[in-house]
Amino acid sequence: MMQHPSWPVGLILSGMPALRDMLNFDPQLARRVIPIELPRLSPIGDLEPLTEMTAFYAQEGGLAPADPAENADIAARLIQAADREFGLAIEITIDAVEEALRLGSSKPSRDHFAAAFARRSGCIDGLNPFIIGEYDRLDVRKLLQREGER
């Protein structure tokens, strides 16, 4: 990577552990990288921060946050829906806020998150973590599932 004082470039690389291995393969690149690793989300330790995050994005979109009990339920389901990945949780939240705005709602609801997840994954309602009761048993990485294909 070339560096030029009048045109500085900064890269943000996001990926799996294999990306870190690739960066470490090149000593020059490894010297120029500041790695920041985000741990996987936990339904125990990260519920409150995700509840705050969903409320933040709702307010940034000009909406009221969901009611506290519903917001906590949304956050728990969001951790599962995002496969415990923080960046994906943010993307789904933004999509849900956009869905609420598109429908003229005053605040995001679980239905908006369900629609955002369905649009992203293509899954049916019976496999949507924002709809079903036992959402924590779903393998959300299997996209475009249909009933009977589990």
Residue ranges and their predicted role:
Residues 43-45, 51-150:
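C-terminal alpha-helical "lid" subdomain
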Residues 1-69, 73:
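The catalytic "switch" region of P-loop NTPases
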